[in-house]
Amino acid sequence: MEKVIITGGAGFIGMNLALYLIKMGYIVSITDIKTPRCKKLIPFFRQIDLLEIDNLKDYFKEISPDYVIHLGARTDLDGETLLDYSANIDGVLNVIAAINSTSSVKKTIFASSRLVCKLGYKPLDENDYLPTTLYGESKVETEKIIKTSKINSDWCIIRPTSIWGPWFGIPYRTFFDAVRSGYYIHPLGVEVNKLFGFVGNSVFQIEKLLVAEGHKVHKKVFYLADYEPINVLQLAKKIRKSFGLSDFIFQLPLIILRIIALSGDIMKIFGLKNPPLTSFRLENLKTNMNFDMNNIIEVVGRDLPFTLDDALDETATWIKHDG
């Protein structure tokens, strides 16, 4: 049975991935600076800071993993300087050092982010970056470190897109809660289509990348998403129906939403961490979002385990009973 270390295993994707790999028969070890909310994962958990290199190396040597999935990172947008994201820069250097100190590792998957490019921007290639946030800049540094380092295993980079599902938090849990409660307001007359990813499909894709032949994934970058764009207004209607509600969605002209978003920006300046709408979120909301998924389809295949309706039902059930 093959052994996997998941850094950031107490995060949203990390917990779902750990549960999936355990179910698939892997020997899973997870590490994070925080304890997993999912109590089933406590026996598999070790609290380790990515910035504590000696502890990290000792942990890797103790486990002797066949695979490493590096999800650990600071992911919020609240940092004031790039130094605030040291977990994404020094942290990845330490993970690489830990991998290189452990001869057992056959393959490593490193998580980056779609925010290495601004929303709506289509990069020319995997080395074309255009971040607009400090978090995005930190993930550009993450990728550059990986691509220029000597790593004693096959490796690839994943860029999760808009991933949602059980155990999620800001921003997509906020979106679901707003839609469910009737507070979500869609821009009137604006059609927005985006690639989202249900986390059940995302962990399926990650495991397929993990076991793929090395030449198919080594030194490549893969976006993580479901394959068909979803109309955001129709998604909001489906979310309401998954909770047994009417599919009515309130809509307002874009100019009014801009005023509300500016109010949210001001609230954030004065210390409110999570206002309902900001200019950044509005820009995200109204921007079509598509990515080149051809390379991951070539490795994983086109068939994913969850349809949109299945995914919504599973997420609604989790929110009602556990979330």
Predicted regions mapped to residue ranges:
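N-terminal Rossmann NAD(P)H-binding glycine-rich loop of SDR-like oxidoreductase domains
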Residues: V4-M24
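Conserved C-terminal active-site "lid" loop/helix of NAD(P)H-dependent oxidoreductases
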Residues: V199, I260-D303
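Amphipathic terminal alpha-helices
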Residues: F291-G323
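Mid/C-terminal beta-alpha module of Rossmann-like enzyme folds, strongest
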Residues: A212-P276, D309, D313-A316
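Active-site Tyr-X1-5-Lys
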Residues: T132-C156
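Conserved Rossmann-fold NAD(P)-dependent oxidoreductase catalytic core, especially the SDR/UDP-sugar
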Residues: L93-L134, C156
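NAD(P)H-binding glycine-rich loop region in Rossmannoid oxidoreductase-like domains
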Residues: L50-D90, G120-P123
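Substrate-positioning beta->alpha
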Residues: F168-T174, L188-V211, K219-Y223
